[in-house]
Amino acid sequence: MSAHNTNESAVGKCPFHEQKEEKSVLARGAGGGTSNRDWWPEQLRVDLLNQHSRRSNPLNEHFNYREEFAKLDYPQLKADLKSLLNDSQEWWPADWGSYIGLFIRMAWHSAGTYRTVDGRGGSGRGQQRFAPLNAWPDNVSLDKARRLLWPVKQKYGQKISWADLYILAGNVALENSGFRTFGFAAGREDVWEPDLDINWGEEKEWLTHRHPESLANAPLGATEMGLIYVNPEGPEASGNPASAAPAIRATFGNMGMNDEEIVALIAGGHTLGKTHGAGEASHVGVDPEAAPLESQGLGWTSSYGSGSGADAITSGLEVIWTQTPTQWSNYFFENLFKYEWVQTHSPAGAIQFEAQDAQASIPDPFDADKKRKPTMLVTDLTLRFDPEFEKISRRFLQDPQSFNEAFARAWFKLTHRDMGPKARYLGPEVPKEDLIWQDPLPAPVHQPSPGEINDVKAQIAQSGLSVSELVSVAWASASTFRGGDKRGGANGARLALAPQKEWPVNAIASRALPQLQAIQQASGKISLADTLVLAGVVGIEQAAAAAGVSIDVPFTPGRVDARQEQTDIDSFDLLQPLADGFRNYRRVTGGPSTETLLIDKAQQLTLSTPELTVLVGGLRVLGTNFDGGKHGVLTEHAGVLSNDFFVNLLDMRTAWRAADDSAELFEGYDRKSGEVRYSATRADLVFGSNAILRASAEVYASADAQQKFITDFVAAWGKVMDLDRFDIR
């Protein structure tokens, strides 16, 4: 007999197709089973502080994007993108033989998720590659746009990030249509996993409607879950152009756009390309995240006809706005006002408008012998039927050059608003003009010497300002930084300007400002921005000395002072914190918990869990509460840099109870005597309550932790002070 197994049931079978389920084996799959968040859905999201770590990054630890970009053959890259635009692929045929419209949409939708309220979203990290954005209903077919770009990305590797490539491809598409753009800046660095910190909304179903008024105080940029801005069929697919105006203003306004910029962007974006709705949505398959393995990251496979080209279904709308959809023109406004418009439906059943009594003058994208009548989206007609939008639209109709200029500037703003200061900009096409939304800074005029720095430090030390005041003023200056859009920070000394000097959270810092301004003016050369940070250096060194430790707090000079005219008051007012748990401040009641807002603030400051922990503990014993209060100052030696906060918080001789029904303020009392020893807020007690934060707090409360505590506090402090120093890195 043969030694080989001749059992027919086993012959030729792939072992992976075995139908028998071994539950004990399946249960061992990593990440399977009921999760902590399933059990405790309100659990504090401390994990948000640990995203985008080195462990998820495939690049070398010392990879420097600025250095890699400097090696890029930029003209050749643009030439390759231009060639790609006109190289129609059989697997995804281009409209009119050009991908101009597709690439403009890709760039727009990459940048268009940005919102000014919290500075999150946008194209700055290449998030369109990841869920949920890669699967949003508004991003149907952009998986194909990104896949079309892959040969170019593959050729240039890490010399160009995906985040930069998306926007550059949109710019090149506009230029290839004959449009002159305002410029382009690179500098967006990719990340390697989805952003977890962005609140896209609470809805559980795609395309759930939100009333525009609900967006006023929320960091949401769209009126429906899964859209970039608004429903193109009008609010809740009403088909009413006039009723869409509030939604358009709310969503574009959350990006910092005014009426002129709104009109320019809508019209400019709809001067080129088309929408796709050749058949009913029932033909369209699942999104990329839900697609089977063999789809290789592509989704929305359509069973309608060929599934692409003339049969493509994207939004379900079938609209071509202009007679030259691959060439820049003023036809959008000419058609908008030349014709009366009648409501109709796309082949997919979506509401749109067609020009009444118009000749068929619009070229078909795949049949040169066919022509169509001009068509518009419901929200396009809003630019005619809203009185304020109409005024601007008619001006652009009569003056195409003003439209071109407005769109060029608005497009640059749209695609660069989340990049932060110009110091981050890279490349040969960076515009020279400073724009107010870039939070411009003057050029440095003096680099203070070590001797000058020491002289100013000595004057600060002799000023009579307390440790609390010195540390508070530096924290107030630097802690406005937002890691999302890279706005805020100490550079510019905007703490001394409106609106920051008037914020209630800065009350103590504002009181210390006049003395520090006098010291800075007497020095003659050092900037106020550097002086404010030096105040914190002096305060911390004094506090460490009081603890018996001699340290030199790192200080990097070279900051400059912004002028009031370089500061958009309304825009900067968005940086005013709802809460700053580092200073035991909360401006509003209701909404997220105080500890949730503390995590939010720490995440904006790009802090890790240990950094958050050590900073709060240090700031409490230094007495930096916004109002000078004693909440959370768990020490008998305020002003001394010690680990007392952690020691006393974790001391089991103290029990805690809510001071009132709000459970925002708590009393710590002696378990034996009942004597009240301390008061604290939720931003304090969370370091004993939350298991993850407590784990770090226990390290700093240990008997051998005093030196480590000071070292770690100084390191985290220095990080915050330099968060906005893009000029030196």
UniProtKB/Swiss-Prot annotation:
Bifunctional enzyme with both catalase and broad-spectrum peroxidase activity. The lineage of its organism: Bacteria, Pseudomonadati, Pseudomonadota, Gammaproteobacteria, Enterobacterales. It comes from Erwinia tasmaniensis (strain DSM 17950 / CFBP 7177 / CIP 109463 / NCPPB 4357 / Et1/99). The record marks 105 as: Transition state stabilizer. The gene is katG. InterPro entries: Catalase_peroxidase, Haem_peroxidase, Haem_peroxidase_sf. This is Catalase-peroxidase. Binds 1 heme b (iron(II)-protoporphyrin IX) group per dimer. GO terms for biological process: cellular response to hydrogen peroxide; hydrogen peroxide catabolic process. Pfam families: peroxidase (PF00141). Residues 15-25 have a biased composition (Basic and acidic residues). Homodimer or homotetramer.
